[in-house]
Amino acid sequence: MRRLEGSMVAIVTPMKDGAVDLRALRDLTEWQLAEGTDGIVPCGTTGEGVTLTPAERADVIRTVIETVRGRALVIAGAGSNATHEAIESVKLAKTLGADAALVVTPYYNKPTQEGLFRHYQAIWEATRFPVVAYNVPSRTSVDLLPETVARLAKAGAIAGIKEATANMDRQVQLVEKVGKDAIAYLSGDDFTVLPYIACGGHGVISVIANVAPRAMKELVVAARSGDLAGALAKQAAMAELNRMMFVETNPGPVKAAVALLGRSGGELRLPLAPVSEASLAKVRDAMVRFGLKLA
């Protein structure tokens, strides 16, 4: 298995007239590779995976894999709050040729820690494919605790975790209980990439990399090489732009930002709605101040 590390993008899913725009997705993927991105993560939260049909998810993942052609990692979004559905999604990622699957903790039904353990264990037993557990309690209302991550790692059920709590004490606990390099530790929070890597993280699955991929790559490289002063300067420089990517619910602002770059339309699928004119102006201003060239 390839090492799951570096600067990865939670890539948006371009849409046009209500349908997935695969041509725009290919172009976005090629641009990400040209900018130095280490991994493409389709069909995650930012990629609106939960509102794609199964056929659309397959098309998106296949398009990314065929475009990448081994030049970067592909970690396919494959989560569900039904274990049997998650298993089928991970099997699809495996069949299509992804490097790993990103599997969010089950949402809405709020399983216990034992339920979470059995969920990921069942996926592993049914697929024998590398899984990155995705812990984002702010969206799912469940928290995959370090003790459970340690159980899963010991059982070989997960290859990594995308941790989106922005809690550095949590990351230290993970390293303590699981082991520094026992699994891949990937940040799911663009605001804390530097401290996360300093606490043993191996990289990031980033939202802002959709619009500033080279800047995120440079931040990750600086942090991983021990250039803390340089990394801090880069983290601080993108702080305002980071905030504006969440001025409304993700992925609304980032899709608007990608459209402002001229790289795809900003169309969203319901129940997500376009960002307001006021929010769009804030996004545009932050992009200009960061030095991005708008279309």
Curated annotation (Swiss-Prot):
Positions bound to pyruvate: 46, 205
Pfam families assigned: DHDPS (PF00701)
GO process terms (BP): diaminopimelate biosynthetic process; lysine biosynthetic process via diaminopimelate
Record carries keyword Mitochondrion: no
Catalytic EC class: lyase
Location within or outside the cell: Cytoplasm
One MF annotation (Gene Ontology) recorded for this entry: 4-hydroxy-tetrahydrodipicolinate synthase activity
Superkingdom per UniProt: Bacteria
Keyword terms, alphabetized: Amino-acid biosynthesis, Cytoplasm, Diaminopimelate biosynthesis, Lyase, Lysine biosynthesis, Schiff base
Main location: cytoplasm
Site (Part of a proton relay during catalysis): 45, 108
GO CC annotation, single: cytosol
Purpose of the protein: Catalyzes the condensation of (S)-aspartate-beta-semialdehyde [(S)-ASA] and pyruvate to 4-hydroxy-tetrahydrodipicolinate (HTPA).
Assembly behavior: Homotetramer; dimer of dimers.
Protein name: 4-hydroxy-tetrahydrodipicolinate synthase
